[in-house]
Amino acid sequence: MDESGAGRRKEDHIDIVLAGGRVASRLDAGFDRVRFVHCALPELDLDAIDLSTRFLGRPLKAPFLISAMTGGPARAESINAHLAEAAQALGIALGVGSQRIAIEDGSAGGLGADLRRRAPDIALFANLGAAQLLAARGLDAARRAVEMIGADVLVIHLNPLQEAIQQGGDRDWRGVFDRIGSLCVSLSAPVVVKEVGFGLSGAVARRLADCGVAALDVAGAGGTNWALVEGERGTGRSRAVATAFADWGIPTAQAVVEVRAACPDLPLIASGGVRHGVDAAKAIRLGADLVGQAAGTLKAAITSTEAVVEHFSQMTDQLRIACFATGAADLDALRRVPLATMD
């Protein structure tokens, strides 16, 4: 794909996701079918509830990840600056969007050394597509992705359905699994593998765990549907093809349960259709260690650093109150509280 076309595609992605509606998954994330048992006598100080955690050795003040959003286009520079500054202020993790354009043509979109200067203390996740590992210098590109932003972790995203519908997308995925395994051995930074909104099954998660990944992000169905996003960008035919996949994928809550059962000890991120801090509490109760949000943050990210801080402060308040209302003094206790129903 030519560089100008890739940049235009990233701009289109921002506009389409902001418009919402038509590209939302027809599946819900599944959190509404999870119910906590309310604790009317918590015997806790709300303000003393501890939401801090560690993920891959990095301390976090709350179990939130600003998930991969955008990389490359000029507009991404201010978005990524706002996200980095907010993550630093909040003490939460930040995952950048795909760095493919930045690596191939230098259009950094805020994905350079300045990002780490804005957020010197956060857990910072670099990002590259799995299909890019198949290129002759794919493993070198992965190392560059980490180095160019001073990242702690490299995220490899799996998006075969999106690529199948995208004009000019990567259609041959033979050898991707072996390249991920090679990367896990050769890269000094931990490797995290994520989907992009269609979910990881327990079987795929187990294969990835066996090849050496440090953590997984289920990135389940229930939020943005990237098949529909690519359909919006394409011709009438590609839009018609994409529409058939409007309800495709593994809902996030189901994916968390499946992956946790398949990989009991592997660090796990839940993302995909997380709306608020109560959804985050449910994801943690089901087995997640960290909770990510992307599209739900985008409007705030375009506005200002302060808007992003306010957005995640609200989510943190909601999570803290959910702990309080279930009698959980910290995240470990939240993982043990009873559930009323899970259909």
Swiss-Prot record:
Keywords: Cytoplasm, Flavoprotein, FMN, Isomerase, Isoprene biosynthesis, Magnesium, Metal-binding, NADP
Keyword NAD found: no
Biological process (GO), any one: isoprenoid biosynthetic process
Residues binding FMN: 67-70, 98, 127, 194, 224, 273-275, 294-295
Any GO molecular function: NADPH binding
Reaction(s) this enzyme catalyzes, per UniProt: isopentenyl diphosphate = dimethylallyl diphosphate
Enzyme Commission no: 5.3.3.2
Gene Ontology CC, one term: cytoplasm
Cofactor (UniProt): FMN; NADPH; Mg(2+)
Residues annotated to bind Mg(2+): 163
Localization: Cytoplasm
The protein's name in its UniProt record: Isopentenyl-diphosphate delta-isomerase
Organism ancestry: Bacteria, Pseudomonadati, Pseudomonadota, Alphaproteobacteria, Hyphomicrobiales
